[in-house]
Amino acid sequence: MVSQFAIEVRNLTYKFKESSDPSVVDINLQIPWNTRSLVVGANGAGKSTLLKLLSGKHLCLDGKILVNGLDPFSPLSMNQVDDDESVEDSTNYQTTTYLGTEWCHMSIINRDIGVLELLKSIGFDHFRERGERLVRILDIDVRWRMHRLSDGQKRRVQLAMGLLKPWRVLLLDEVTVDLDVIARARLLEFLKWETETRRCSVVYATHIFDGLAKWPNQVYHMKSGKIVDNLDYQKDVEFSEVVNAKVNGQVAFENDNNKVVISKVNSLHPLALEWLKRDNQIPDKEIGI
């Protein structure tokens, strides 16, 4: 059976044992298939914790999480066969792919090993067409040796490894920070194409907003473990070419219809900056800027 939503979360609260306050508080989400969701928030807002819960890396004890209709912590979610695929096809997909900060520090990236050898060890020959596409998109030379690469080059190889096997739900946590502008733009365009051509969805937490103006379907703002803003990109976000009384600086909030107006730029950076300033509650003038 094909689930109605890629991700469904009900009344999710999570607290680390060593913490007195929960990191995630009463989260409710319904993320449809074929969508791209952007998660915005200051450090410590709960973004990484939420993504780890969605991936099954933390056990949910208070609330309910369904990814592709199943609990991500359940072993059943690894071998699910949906109505729109055969058993053979299902082996070519994994329900959830999580690429986060600890994944970026895997020890193998510093070994003296060839890139092609590394890719072949995780199924490059089986997913050759997809692998070759990722190599082109990320501008990877398969003759590279991993221990000789820059941080940015290593990150590109890691992303090719992480994205090689197709996924139903992709969870990205700050993994594009080392990419140059071109590699990042190509990667985002590839992920957009993926969500438009097959049944899958992406949730992306980041502090880098340039080039994202036309990318997401939903924008979620997290503060103190809660989702405090949830914007439908088509309905709630407007880019204005005229900076007038309606737009105070670069962003204006219309309280009557929950709409956000942003001065005409190809970036969600002004909105993210305004949200984080409000979260911080310290006016710029008080810190001398």
Curated annotation (Swiss-Prot):
Domain ABC transporter: from-to ranges: 7-249
GO biological processes: regulation of transcription by RNA polymerase II
Pfam families named among the record's database cross-references: ABC_tran
Entry-linked InterPro entries: AAA+_ATPase, ABC_transporter-like_ATP-bd, P-loop_NTPase
Binding site for ATP: G41, A42, N43, G44, A45, G46, K47, S48
Subcellular location: Cytoplasm; Nucleus
Assigned keywords, A-Z: ATP-binding, Cytoplasm, Nucleotide-binding, Nucleus
Quaternary structure annotation from Swiss-Prot or TrEMBL: Interacts with CCR4 and SSN2.
Remaining remarks: Present with 1620 molecules/cell in log phase SD medium.
The name this protein goes by in its record: CCR4-associated factor 16
Organism: Saccharomyces cerevisiae (strain ATCC 204508 / S288c) (Baker's yeast)
